[in-house]
């Protein structure tokens, strides 16, 4: 994880989608929030959020006639990276321990895996998680719940 004086913002997959797809129901909220951030704010992708964004942008059931090609997905991602407003973070030390703490229950909860990963990544990396998911926001100290 690079060190800097920048605020490190870690959007979940749905926030990334809303920032990059104008027809997303939460796009106006996401863009208003984004526009109010200081110029020095840095956005963080992890491999999970990168692939999740690509998957949603290229899924017809999500974007209907606006479904994007792989090349278009890469172009959106490259704009973030090339602009210097975002970077890809490697998995921070302590991630797996944090994930195990959150996802070691006796019940089968398939939807918990990704949330546990994102929460643990944010905490281990000292990142500010941003999400539309109220329950996920409650799991991470300092998380931002949009909407």
PLM feature segments, named:
Residues 18, 54-55, 78, 82:
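Generic alpha-helical structural context detector
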Residues 1-10, 14-45, 60-72:
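Short, well-structured N-terminal submotif of metal-dependent ribonuclease cores
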Residues 20, 57, 140-141:
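Short, flexible helix/strand-to-coil boundary loops that buttress conserved ligand/catalytic motifs
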């Amino acid at each position: 994880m690079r060190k800097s004086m920048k605020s490190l913002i870690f959007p979940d997959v749905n926030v990334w989608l809303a920032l990059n797809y104008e027809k997303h129901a939460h796009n106006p909220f996401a863009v208003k929030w984004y526009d109010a951030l200081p110029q020095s704010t840095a956005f963080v992708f992890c491999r999970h959020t990168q692939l999740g964004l690509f998957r949603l942008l290229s899924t017809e059931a999500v974007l209907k006639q606006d479904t994007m090609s792989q090349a278009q997905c890469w172009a959106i991602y490259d704009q973030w990276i090339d602009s210097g407003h975002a970077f890809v973070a490697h998995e921070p030390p302590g991630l797996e321990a944090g994930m195990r703490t959150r996802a070691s229950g006796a019940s089968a909860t398939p939807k918990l895996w990704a949330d546990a990963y994102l929460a643990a990544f944010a905490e281990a990396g000292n990142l500010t998680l941003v999400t539309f998911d109220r329950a996920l926001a409650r799991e991470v100290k300092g998380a931002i719940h949009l909407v």
